[in-house]
């Protein structure tokens, strides 16, 4: 049982102003596995004051000092590898291999990349007799989601530290343990007091007062569009800078020259990875009408190989949905797909056979889907695919872009020129050709209702900076 009833503020673990706590549930067992403090506005006030008090000192720290700090974090992060893996498997229900190879590793990648970025990042530039300088924006509020407990926190923290901006972090109350471990790491390596502050709690008690606090100059949020809109509204009252990474309904375009077995394997991975709880999940699979029969046969075969089950059992690829509430949401979308006339091709409502305990969902494929159906337009956040056919490339691109979202897109095929054309045509912030994979120095963020701003690498650092021009500096 993990019980974290204190907040980390100004370099110390202190009692929360509130005596209330939030229970953390293991979604694979439905058991309470710990609790965290349910913070309030007084906790936020203390954290913001601590960050504000150190702001000028941290802003004026040297690049060398900040790089050394990031390098120390990297080494201690590695020392806590097993703790991080165990925490994520317990709180998120991610299979152990996924916790290690994706969750743990992505967090590490962001701290390493922020350090590398500082080697060449230009904080100052001369233009004639003028100086253009980039300065840390100031106290930054970070609000992170439950689906990637280390990735989303690490990428924001690494960028803020590299920029010289102190932070107040509010992690998701559903997966808070990984953030506590990060706080322990920062404490161990000597992150200066006030530079990092952790306030656990819910959106109403912590997220809202953080977004509205007049001394917070930047809000960085990852999560739902609904919550992002609220944060933006609250932050706008005193014109805070806002960076938002929101939802997606990403298209995966399968070209007509593709190997269908290869394409089926690739698209399956993009649907079921992290139990479909991925903002970039490629759940709208667009296939040529001429390849439909062969592709669907291969897709069903790939889905049938996916092992759903105990995240601690060897060979498990897909764990549970995060909560009963989210499980019910996924089920309601499956029901909606059937109701609107999509054909259930694989999976369906309910839990996989033999998995009565835990919030396990059946990986599901809908075919004969129209792009205007609810399941093709709304983010489900579960392992549910919508297969849509197209007759020509222009139609495929039109369907791909017929969405309010624009976070990611995928294309698989053989002809390089066609692949590049499709990649350039999809209206989204991140496109992947032939399963190219993640690259931590590439910018990440969305078009349209998928967000504002960019994260990862030097682009992420830019979000935590203000730009100042000084005319006559060199005259």
Curated annotation (Swiss-Prot):
Family, as annotated: Belongs to the aldehyde dehydrogenase family.
Source species of the chain: Staphylococcus haemolyticus (strain JCSC1435)
Catalytic activity as recorded in UniProt: an aldehyde + NAD(+) + H2O = a carboxylate + NADH + 2 H(+)
GO MF terms held by the record: aldehyde dehydrogenase (NAD+) activity
Enzyme class: oxidoreductase
E.C. no: 1.2.1.3
Catalytic residue positions: 245, 279
Annotated positions binding NAD(+): 201-207
Transmembrane intervals: none
SUPFAM superfamilies from the UniProt entry: ALDH-like
Name of the protein described by the UniProt record: Putative aldehyde dehydrogenase SH0913
Keyword tags: NAD, Oxidoreductase
Keyword Hydrolase included in the entry's annotation: no
UniProt xrefs under CDD domains: ALDH_CddD_SSP0762
